[in-house]
From Swiss-Prot:
Belongs to the ATPase delta chain family. This is ATP synthase subunit delta. F(1)F(0) ATP synthase produces ATP from ADP in the presence of a proton or sodium gradient. F-type ATPases consist of two structural domains, F(1) containing the extramembraneous catalytic core and F(0) containing the membrane proton channel, linked together by a central stalk and a peripheral stalk. During catalysis, ATP synthesis in the catalytic domain of F(1) is coupled via a rotary mechanism of the central stalk subunits to proton translocation. This protein is part of the stalk that links CF(0) to CF(1). It either transmits conformational changes from CF(0) to CF(1) or is implicated in proton conduction. Disulfide bonds: none annotated. Pfam families: OSCP (PF00213). GO terms for cellular component: plasma membrane; proton-transporting ATP synthase complex. The gene is atpH. SUPFAM superfamilies: N-terminal domain of the delta subunit of the F1F0-ATP synthase. F-type ATPases have 2 components, F(1) - the catalytic core - and F(0) - the membrane proton channel. F(1) has five subunits: alpha(3), beta(3), gamma(1), delta(1), epsilon(1). F(0) has three main subunits: a(1), b(2) and c(10-14). The alpha and beta chains form an alternating ring which encloses part of the gamma chain. F(1) is attached to F(0) by a central stalk formed by the gamma and epsilon chains, while a peripheral stalk is formed by the delta and b chains.
Length: 177
């Protein structure tokens, strides 16, 4: 959701900056991952949305559920709870993860395929994409049957659409203009 991304960005950047200062980038990534997963669970999501539960109770429950030990991460959860922003934790995690990859000179890539890919195919694609984008890529694969065939690759804001659906859309656009 674009709105969540906009709201989460300053929180992710601030937390990442603090993590750099404290030399805790990787360890906080793990804590954020757990927090993001917990707030998406049904009962916890309902609790977060309940106006009757005050912010400090929500923060304490999350901190206990995840088992956070780090003082700064606990304070971060308390700040988010006070601002009624706990629901953006998954987006904060995603952006923090992107900042971590960027810091380590790695880009995130998603390969969308109409059909499951073998490990060999993913490996070959990874080699080609690493060369094309002149960067080390962390690749994930998602199945999207609506592509009909072929693949679509997203690296940051760049999209390489080699799918049948993409070609049909381009053909349709050409024919209707």
């Amino acid at each position: 959701m674009a709105e969540f991304a906009t709201i989460a960005r300053p929180y992710a950047k601030a937390l990442f900056g603090l993590a750099q200062e404290k030399n805790q980038i990787e360890s906080w990534l793990g804590g954020l991952e757990k927090l993001a997963a917990v707030v998406q669970e049904g009962k916890v999501a309902l609790l977060i949305d309940r106006p009757e539960t005050n912010a400090s109770e929500k923060a304490d429950i999350l901190i206990d559920l995840v088992g956070l030990k780090d003082k700064e991460l606990k304070n971060f959860v308390i700040v988010l709870a006070g601002q009624k922003r706990l629901s953006i934790l998954p987006e904060v995690y995603a952006q923090y993860q992107d900042l971590t990859l960027s810091f380590n000179h790695i880009k995130s890539a998603v390969i969308y395929s109409a059909y499951p890919l073998t490990d060999k195919q993913v490996g070959e694609l990874a080699q080609m994409l690493n060369k094309r984008f002149d960067s080390e890529l962390k690749i994930s694969v998602e199945i999207e049957p609506e592509l009909i065939g072929g693949i679509k690759v997203e690296v940051g804001d760049q999209v390489l659409d080699l799918s049948v659906q993409g070609k049909l859309s381009a053909l349709y656009t050409t024919m209707t203009n």
